[in-house]
Amino acid sequence: MPIAELAVIKTVGGPLIAAALGVGAQVIYDGFRKGKDTSIINRLGRTMESISPVRDRIGKLSNVEGKPFREVHESLTRLLEDAKSIIEKYWKLRWSRHVCRKYRYIKKLESIELELVRVAREIQVHQWTDIKEMKAIQVHQWTDIKEMKAIQVDQWTDIKEMKAIQVDQWIDIKEMKAIQVDQWTDIKEMKAQISEKHNK
């Protein structure tokens, strides 16, 4: 191709090529953006699915435990409802050209996802703390049970010792009675001897 023709192509075709490349780049970027947005929404959907049962259990506990659980339940409910609402709005705009609005929705969803993850981690921390506290309580209870058993053993030992003392006392009483009987027999014999001497 002659140099002059190349120059014409460069001069006239340059803007067209640039425009074509720009459109191609925009298409690629839009595809990437939609893929990324869809990935965020799918990930958030999985997070919502995993947290919803936890939210329901906390709701049941809030009826028993009171304010702390009720506040967590309300916070999770609000976040899940906000996420659902924004996802619905995003899907309505998915194929439109409202790029800025879609971008804002995605940013809100990312923020909600982070907040949901944070709350879930706090719940896990509280659960772990509760488990450790329950284990500590169980250890104390087991210690108390062992101490009570030791006290019962000591009491049983004391009872056996008291019974042994009572047996010894009973033996002593029987021996004293036997001695008294012997003494009484001796006294009667002495009286009989004195009476015989007196009669003679």
Swiss-Prot record:
UniProt-listed GO biological process terms: plant-type hypersensitive response; response to bacterium; response to ethylene; response to external biotic stimulus; response to fungus; response to jasmonic acid; response to salicylic acid; response to symbiotic bacterium
Induction comment from the UniProt entry of this chain: Expressed in leaves after powdery mildew infection (e.g. Erysiphe cichoracearum UCSC1). Accumulates upon oviposition by pierid butterflies (e.g. Pieris brassicae). Induced in seedlings by the beneficial symbiotic fungus Trichoderma atroviride and, by the plant growth-promoting rhizobacterium (PGPR) Pseudomonas fluorescens after a transient repression. Expressed after infection by the bacterial pathogenic Pseudomonas syringae pv. tomato DC3000. Triggered by various phytohormones such as ethylene (ET), salicylic acid (SA) and methyl jasmonate (MeJA).
Transmembrane helix is among the record's keywords: yes
Membrane topology type: Single-pass membrane protein
Record's signal peptide: none
Record-linked InterPro entries: Powdery_mildew-R_dom (IPR008808)
Membrane-crossing residue ranges in chain numbering: 7-29
Residue ranges that the Swiss-Prot or TrEMBL entry lists as coiled coil: 70-127
Further comment: Ecotypes susceptible to Erysiphe cichoracearum, such as cv. Columbia, are lacking RPW8.1 and RPW8.2 but contain in place HR4.
Task performed by this protein: Probable disease resistance (R) protein.
Family named by the database record: Belongs to the plant RPW8 protein family.
Protein name: RPW8-like protein 4
Lineage, highest ranks first: Eukaryota, Viridiplantae, Streptophyta, Embryophyta, Tracheophyta
Recorded name of the encoding gene: HR4
